[in-house]
Design a protein with these regions (language model features):
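Catalytic PLP-binding core of fold-type I/II PLP enzymes
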Residues: 180-194
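Short, acidic, Ser/Thr-enriched surface-loop or helix-capping motifs
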Residues: 20-21
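Glycine-rich loop-to-alpha-helix module at the N-terminal edge of alpha/beta enzyme cores
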Residues: 25-109
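Short acidic, glycine-rich surface-loop motifs adjacent to enzyme active sites
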Residues: 164-179
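Residue-level signal for well-ordered, solvent-exposed loop/turn and beta-edge residues enriched
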Residues: 24-25, 179
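PLP-dependent aspartate aminotransferase-fold enzymes
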Residues: 73-167
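Active-site-adjacent loop/helix segments that line or gate small-molecule/cofactor pockets in enzymes
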Residues: 1-14, 74
């Protein structure tokens, strides 16, 4: 089991509320892993998704897609970055997987530092960087990841000093491992070292 399964079946949502199969109403502070942060059934979201599904539901990224280009331009403008690269993917696991691979391509190293209790996804490398042996298959156990206690700056600095670290991956607000926050001093130490 990746997540604890709660005895509730959510069947519909509107705004910041969801309802279960017995029509009990809940204030949704979870948002499906924070994926639906705009609220459930937002009219603009429904209109845009419906319009796109009436045109084309999916196609490979091996061809040009003006929507991706427009999105990249809008994202770059909103973020204040004029010179950047964007790789559109489907999930956080894929984002983490590709970030770790890019780091390894860049520096040729393989060792990753991750935090105890962290969850980074279920793809091959992301699951290896996830601190949950129950979902880590033998093929994922490559000893490339060193798990350190979150916010243990001394242990982090000691590991970085070895000079063989490819990447550091931090879940700033741990969800699955409990609601644990990376503190400011720790994040500043990570930024300085990296």
């Amino acid at each position: 089991d990746v997540f604890p399964l709660y005895d509730v079946e959510i069947v519909r949502g509107r705004g910041c509320n969801v309802w279960d199969a017995d029509d009990n109403k809940y204030l949704d502070l979870y948002g499906g892993h924070a994926v639906i942060s705009i609220g459930h059934c937002h009219p603009h979201y429904i209109e845009c998704v419906s319009r796109q599904l009436n045109r084309l539901g999916f196609y490979s990224n091996s061809v040009q897609n003006h929507l991706q280009t427009e999105f990249a331009e809008r994202l770059g403008k909103a973020s204040g970055y004029e010179d950047y690269s964007l790789f559109l993917i489907n999930s956080g696991a894929e984002a983490n997987e590709n970030a770790l691979k890019l780091a390894s391509f860049y520096n040729g190293r393989t060792r990753v530092i991750a935090s105890a209790g962290a969850f980074h996804g279920r793809t091959s490398l992301a699951v290896e960087a996830t601190d949950n042996p129950k979902i880590n298959a033998p093929i994922n156990k490559n000893s490339h990841v060193t798990f350190l206690p979150l916010n243990d700056t001394e242990a982090f600095v000691s590991e970085i000093a070895k000079g063989d670290v490819c990447a550091v991956i931090v879940e700033c607000i741990q969800g699955v491992g409990g609601i644990h926050l990376a503190n400011k001093a720790f994040m500043q130490a990570v930024r300085k070292a990296c």
